[in-house]
Amino acid sequence: MDRLDIDKKRAIELGVRYVNIHWKSVIETEVEVSVLSGGYSSRLYLVEDTSTSKSNPIRKFLVRLYGGKIVTGDDPIRPEGGEVKETLVFYAMDLAGLGPKLYGSFDGGRVEQFVPSQMLRDVGYDQRSETMSELARKLARFHSLDLPISQERHQVLDVCEFYLEKRDFEQFRRLAHHFGFMDVSRFEDLDVKSEIQWLRKVEQLVNGRIVTISGDLNKNNILIRDEPDKFGERVMMIDYELAARDYRGRDIGQVFAYKVLEMKDDCFRICCEYPDETWRRAFVTEYLKQTKSLNYFEWDEKLDNVDHVLMEAEFFMFHSIHMITGIFINQKEDSVFYNMPADMVLSMLDFGSYFINMYHQRKALFIETYGKLLNLIE
């Protein structure tokens, strides 16, 4: 388990200052602080009052400390604005009833509401038929947020080119071999430069609406609440480190791509196949239905129809795959990977390799499906 970067005394101080004055009567021996997660650029801790007293109305809260372990502060994957931007998004989600309450913000982190919930699992889509449609509606509401953040589009392909220029395959090969991941051919054979050129060309042809996106819709960032929210829904999106202005298709494409991936026993596992067209079409249909009801832009039937948004999602999903594999390939001699459990690192390299293979398969299918429409086939 990670070492704690926050002690019990500091946890109580934050509880008193931002959560509820009753935390003043809590003593250190009655407090438990545990690690929940370490994201791209922050770490999350659960603080709990374990006393038998019933006087404390809020017995659990979360502390998020900025400063991640996989991505450094100057990594271009992080959109402009950093922690200030992320806190603004979090607060806006709170006010809109879309996410947890923001109790307070301090230098180096923030204090958040603990919402009893569990991470989305693929089986959750089957066990609860509303899950997929609720996620589609939540995403549509998120995209409609009008936020005081940079209105310039976050250029993911620029990030991918940055990774391309900085990568060192010898260092990556040593890291992979250190953990027993011997076949790195998929990573080495991916012609990133040519692929980025192709993506830049096709990006202009696909087009789509630019909105406020989450930028990181893996299942760890999608929770199923124990109790419904004000919309009567249980799906909740969290973690807005990568929120920015970009094409809506990037978020929707991530929902599709990341459906195949989830964590089990602290390792990433491929849990299912890429969602079929029926599933994808149902998701986009619900997304557009909710989007139209929000009425935050002038509707265009040529752009805002199911077929076009499906095309957007299928294309902009490619950007996310390049971004993920770029992060992996750019791990250096001082990479945090060396301090992680071997099984965890192997699982990340496995899914990186799987995603590269999925990229080639989905790209071929994209050209087959949309090649004539976009004049990609002569």
Please describe what each predicted stretch is.
Residues 296-318:
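All-alpha amphipathic helical-bundle segments outside canonical DNA-binding/catalytic cores
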Residues 1-35:
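Juxta-kinase regulatory segment immediately upstream of eukaryotic protein kinase catalytic domains
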Residues 293-301, 320-378:
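ATP/Mg2+ or Mg2+-diphosphate-binding catalytic cores
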Residues 212-214, 219:
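Catalytic-loop of the protein kinase fold
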Residues 159-166, 314-327:
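Hydrophobic alpha-helical segments that form the core
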Residues 222-261:
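Catalytic activation segment of kinase domains across protein kinase-like and atypical kinase folds
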Residues 34-36, 40-191, 202-209, 232:
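ATP-binding pocket architecture of kinase catalytic cores
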Residues 249-298, 318-336:
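Active-site activation/catalytic loop segments of kinase-like enzymes and analogous catalytic loops
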